Amino acid sequence: MNRIAVLNVVGLSDRHIGPHTPRLFALRQRWHHASIDPAIPAVTCTAQSDYLTGRRPSEHGIVANGWYDRSLSEVQFWKQSNHLVQAPKIWDELKARDPRFTCAKMFWWYNMYSGADWSVTPRPMYPADGRKFFDVYTWPYDLRPALKKALGDFPFATFWGPAAGVKSPQGAPDAATRWIAGSAKWIEKKHSPTLNLVYLPHLDYNLQRLGPQHPAVADDLRRIDAIVGDLLDFFAARGVQPILLSEYGITPVSRPVHLNRIFRERGWVTIKEELGLELPDIGNSKAFAVADHQVAHIVVNDPSIEDKVREVVLETPGVAEVYGPADKRILGLDHSRSGNLIAVAQEDSWFTYYHWLDDAKAPDFARCVDIHRKPGYDPVELFLDPAIPSAKLKILGRLLQKKLGFRMLMDVIPLDASLVKGSHGARPSSPLDWPIILSEQRLPADTLRSTEVYGVLKSAVLG
């Protein structure tokens, strides 16, 4: 078997390879290249599951980054157990062929209990007193102290939130990505896995925060180019063949679409008041949209209104398509976790999870970075609220409260969805905005389906 390192450069598309990315540009000239017709939806968990199983969501079950669990009547996002992926993974097949095969998963998702030999993934600790401590989960457990001794603590605050992709007291703009790259090199030196899956998220932040056309993105491109170049040199020196790919491309957006507010105004969303704030009671709602970037899985608990829901969503500005049962079968999205209907935004639009009509009644978690409690993806977590005078001083005050043992809310996130300037999830109209794959080995076509990446990776290992 050949030894392979898969460098997952999140958000990279052909549109970004140029003067600001000399290493990637040279690679694009020398290596074989293909565009990837993006996963549906083109989001992290679905794309990775397509790549690592060779199956579509109808088989592997990862219909988005999160979904409505009908048995619990709860929306659950960003879960970590690999048992959620309901199809064999590439390491299962390759290990069955040769027991000597080993795999490291460095920050790819569904990274707990996966069967990979070494895993590292972000995982805070939550003591019973309500506090939160940034940390990572590793398998084996002894990997965690060894990595932290070699690299220091993982700069979690720079992995997601207002400090991600910007210079801050928490670290350099690319601190999280550099730490992950360092962990991939450490794993290679210590264990030499056959397949090393490396997640490099740096571009993801400002492409969403500022938009892919913003001039400041040039600095992000230079930073990721340097990180990738260093990894290419490192792996080449050790006889490891790199493959570079991305999960999706990010396109400019200017219109947030608030489906749950529309549903609420029609009486379809049931609201529960708690301590003067409003929470959605999804199990008692007639319809609710589970928003994930440019895709929304629409749960319809009252079958008698499904046609009306579809009509209302299709008439909503910013909505491109609404898929029903027949469409889901064709697209490989016919799975029990999918919504009864699936809405796809126009390329310049994206879906919020917002259900409140008055910001004063928004739930407390809305103004926090809280990826698990929110019933949908929230890119506004990348911003500090511009309405808060001296927001950074407020953060310092909150951190002091935490250090003194007081409970506190890090409520510094705005509720203005118009701040977001880039998104993904829909299929971009231009292939220049599609994900890509670069390899020293010949690729089977100039354009690959997302499920065909599996075969490329398997062939690279098997030779």
Task: List PLM regions with ranges.
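Short, solvent-exposed loop/turn segments at secondary-structure junctions
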Residues: 11-14, 41-42, 57-58, 108-113, ...
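Short, structured active-site-proximal loop/turn typified by the sulfatase FGly-forming signature C/S-X-P-X-R
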Residues: 15-59, 102-104
